[in-house]
Structures are given as C-alpha cells and as structure tokens.
Amino acid sequence: MTTLIHVLGSNLPHHNQTVLTFFNDVICQEMAPSSKPHFMVVSDDAQLADAYPQLKIDVFANKQAIANSVIQRAKADRRTRFFFHGQFNAPIWLALLFGQIKSHQFWWHIWGA
C-alpha cells in the first residue's frame, strides 16, 4: 500500500486550520478511511493534534524541521507520496529541484483563504 502524507509546510494557522478541520470533520466522517489521514504540519501549537482526533498529525517547529523530515521520509521509501497543500516552504522546493524528493512523490495544490 502506498503511503500518502499531507504536508502543511508553513505556520499559517488560518490556512492549516481550514484544511485540518475539513479532513477531520468531513473527509473522515463521510469516507470512513481505514486509517487516519497523516499530516505533517508547521505550528507553534505543540498540542495541535488534540483538536483533530480523526487525524494523525506530526507537528514541527519550523519550515526547516519539516523539510528535513519530508526529505528523510522521501529518501527512505520512494513509494511514499506527499501532498503539499499551499506550499510556502523554500527548503522543500529546493529538495524537489535537487532530487532529494522525486517528482513522482510530489503532489501539490495551491489554495488561498
């Protein structure tokens, strides 16, 4: 089975809350996934995951920390896929440019508030 990880790579609470709430309250209720959707999120709130019990959330203190973790996961298993929601994280873009994250692993969606 392919691993899919959603990445919110910047500390933008108003954007991140919208995405997390939608997945927690709508996707998980309507689709009843077999496992919790996995998110990696930059946030000042270390307890962020408590607000979204239907999701598996890894919280990172800053953009570089999340980029390092994404790169490590991407290199460890090239079957892992990442869905980047509104990506404002230069280290992640550079990792894609220089092949640390392969293009087949990188899905991106831009959105606004």
Where are these regions (language model features)?
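A short acidic, amphipathic alpha-helical/loop segment
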Residues: T18-V26, S69-V70, I92-F98
